[in-house]
UniProtKB/Swiss-Prot annotation:
UniProt KW keywords: Cytoplasm, DNA damage, DNA repair, Endonuclease, Hydrolase, Magnesium, Metal-binding, Nuclease
Annotated source species: Shigella flexneri
Record's subcellular location: Cytoplasm
Its job: DNA repair enzyme involved in the repair of deaminated bases. Selectively cleaves double-stranded DNA at the second phosphodiester bond 3' to a deoxyinosine leaving behind the intact lesion on the nicked DNA.
Family per record: Belongs to the endonuclease V family.
Name used for this protein in its record: Endonuclease V
The encoding gene: nfi
Any one GO CC term of the record: cytoplasm
Cofactor(s) the protein needs: Mg(2+)
Taxonomy of the source species: Bacteria, Pseudomonadati, Pseudomonadota, Gammaproteobacteria, Enterobacterales
Site feature location: Interaction with target DNA: Y73
UniProt record, GO biological process: DNA repair
Enzyme class name: hydrolase
Amino acid sequence: MDLASLRAQQIELASSVICEDRLDKDPPDLIAGADVGFEQGGEVTRAAMVLLKYPSLELVEYKVARIATTMPYIPGFLSFREYPALLAAWEMLSQKPDLVFVDGHGISHPRRLGVASHFGLLVDVPTIGVAKKRLCGKFEPLSSKPGALAPLMDKGEQLAWVWRSKARCNPLFIATGHRVSVDSALAWVQRCMKGYRLPEPTRWADAVASERPAFVRYTANQP
């Protein structure tokens, strides 16, 4: 594995990320959520993609792609492992969204190219990274109250907002993926909350990918 080459690719791709609002449709009609996981001891990569109407946040479509994993887990290079399955799920959708929430980092990455940014560049769609853990940067401690907020900073640059979406839950790291500003990324995540830790797009993507009870109930109620 030529990590020097991959690192150079990351730096080059990151230079093309657009960190300002360039949505083709604002507000969007459809918002997607994307989540990637691994099965069979990592041999299979699974990507779930859901489509939600906006502003109702009603689930209207879901697809799950499973492909052979082509790259081992290497910290800092996860997007190269995940994006092939995301592209496969993207191609399965009957209609394309105006905005995509990706479970993972956007520019809040040491080389400013998390999976949300990488995927957004590949398909040229506005994306937001919604991550559950910090990958780089520093932030001031948050209060325990829901709504607590702090910028994630690295070398004088704001990479994300750190936001406690729910009491007694760890905060989310909300970042530009591509074609969305960091402030708009936070605003869109906040608009898509329904009382859970995660915004509805990535909450549903996770539920579909892992066949959680919410998804089982949803499928049971479908005609």
